[in-house]
Amino acid sequence: MNGNLLEVINRLSSLRPIFNMEADFQFALAWEIQKKFPDWSVRFEKKPPNLKDRIFVDLWIEGDETCAIELKYKTRRFDIDVKGESFNLLNQGAQDLGRYDFLKDVERLENIVSAHDNVKGYAIILTNDSSYWKSTATETIDTKFRIHDGRVLNGELAWRPEASSGTVRGREKPIKLTGTYKLNWKDYSQVSGTSYGKFRYLFLEI
């Protein structure tokens, strides 16, 4: 599925170089997968079998193989008309929480994959916010959760001790990864020459 999914994303980038929101991205990707594989089952917000916890994945696909896909779409404020359609993206901010949530997706997918014999997992984040893919030498409370290009992720990832309880409320637990991931960001689209007109994505196979 890895190669097929990357092929679908590549095609989607020419058809839909920008999305209104995460649900728009989720539906568009599911639609392209269904078009390419019309006999496959594509389901939204599916609870995988064989799990005690109430865990749901963004996309659950059953065909020649079964896979679970988690998606994130993180944006900076950006207004543009593309192919006759107006897009008014919000400035989501809170990049530290965005990184944590993406890595929580990876941890969740690891648990799903380990509970099934023939399931693959894919975590995808698409963004026009370069702070996700660019590295920084500055130490921040979310240093361990950084997902910049070229980084290798594994093991236990936790907030720095000075992180306030208000900032990390609901996300206090460290993330524990059993796999090792070399982060390789890819270009998705360039809808304008402005700072936030470039979209890139990170694709991790679990």
State the predicted function of each range.
Residues 86-100:
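Surface-exposed cleft-lining segments at the edges of enzyme active sites
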Residues 110-141:
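Nucleic-acid nuclease catalytic cores
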Residues 96-108, 141-146:
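Well-ordered, non-membrane alpha-helical segments in soluble/globular domains
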Residues 33-60:
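A short acidic/basic microdomain associated with nuclease active sites
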Residues 1-36:
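Interdomain/boundary linker segments immediately adjacent to catalytic/signaling cores
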Residues 59-61, 65-89, 109:
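Conserved catalytic cores of phosphodiester-cleaving nucleases, focusing on short active-site segments
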Residues 10, 42-43, 47-51, 67, ...:
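N-terminal intrinsically disordered, cationic/polar leader segments
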Residues 130-206:
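Non-catalytic C-terminal interaction segments of nucleic acid-processing enzymes
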